[in-house]
């Protein structure tokens, strides 16, 4: 199970913490980083157990779980840009009058109204979440869906993929198996996303690649590796330095 699945299957308290305990490991829900329980980690002369070291990892990498979550695509948070900004200011501990001055929004009472609106949104979310949990117990016909990558951008209908559909697409375009060559790259955008996410599994998370290394891996997949590489960057699966000297697999 990749970290996107772990993220979406985690409970509220686990998400607030930013990591889960899985067997003998502590797993980061934000990027999949794992630390072994029972091992003492040393950093700058200080010793940490696995959980404390994970909290340090989250703090150094993202600032906080709040900072990570607030930066997700609005299709995933359900927040408008305006609501997102207000939540950040509330989280910083600013008072209504200070926020009004900072944003130029109406008056302090206007900010209080926004607080009420967010509280109402929270109540609705709790009820909806409970309804969906109850629905899972009764709806035996719901298809298994492929989880949306946590770091996905421009989330739209392309991400509306069932597991059955995903398997059919991979079988069609990788006739000799997903570790073989791609039959063609001429396909609808939704299918491109499925195929590109599968190709991304050929890269190692956290490893830095030079362009020739990227090209060599993609040539094993498809002759027009330049087009595949470009799409992987456009779809946010690969990232690179501005000069193209280094590439790496983006966090999903």
Regions found by a protein language model. Name each.
Residues 74-95:
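Short amphipathic alpha helix immediately N-terminal
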Residues 114-125, 214:
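DNA major-groove recognition helices of helix-turn-helix
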Residues 167-203:
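Short alpha-helical segments that sit at the start of domains
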């Amino acid at each position: 199970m990749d970290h996107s699945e772990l993220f979406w299957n985690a409970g509220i308290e686990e998400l607030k913490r930013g990591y889960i305990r899985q067997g003998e490991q502590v797993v980061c829900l934000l990027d999949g980083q794992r630390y072994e329980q029972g091992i003492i980690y040393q950093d700058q002369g200080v010793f940490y157990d696995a959980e404390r070291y994970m909290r340090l990892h989250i703090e150094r990498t993202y600032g906080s779980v709040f900072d990570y979550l607030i930066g997700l695509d609005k299709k995933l948070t359900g927040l408008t840009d305006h609501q997102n900004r207000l939540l950040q200011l509330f989280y910083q501990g600013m008072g209504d009058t200070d926020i009004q001055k900072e944003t130029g929004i109406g008056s302090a009472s206007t900010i209080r109204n926004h607080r009420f609106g967010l509280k109402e949104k929270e109540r609705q979310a709790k009820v909806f979440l409970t309804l969906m949990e109850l629905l899972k117990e009764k709806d035996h016909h719901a298809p298994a869906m492929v989880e949306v990558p946590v770091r996905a951008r421009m989330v739209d209908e392309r991400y509306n993929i069932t597991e059955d559909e995903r398997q059919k697409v991979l079988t069609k375009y990788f006739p000799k198996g997903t570790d073989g060559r791609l039959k063609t790259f001429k396909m609808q955008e939704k299918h491109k996303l499925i195929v590109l996410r599968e190709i991304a599994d050929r890269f190692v998370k956290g490893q830095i690649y030079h362009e020739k290394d990227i090209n060599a891996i993609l040539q094993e997949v498809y002759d027009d590796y330049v087009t595949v590489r470009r799409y992987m960057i456009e779809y946010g699966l690969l990232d690179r330095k501005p000069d193209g000297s280094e590439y790496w697999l983006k966090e999903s």
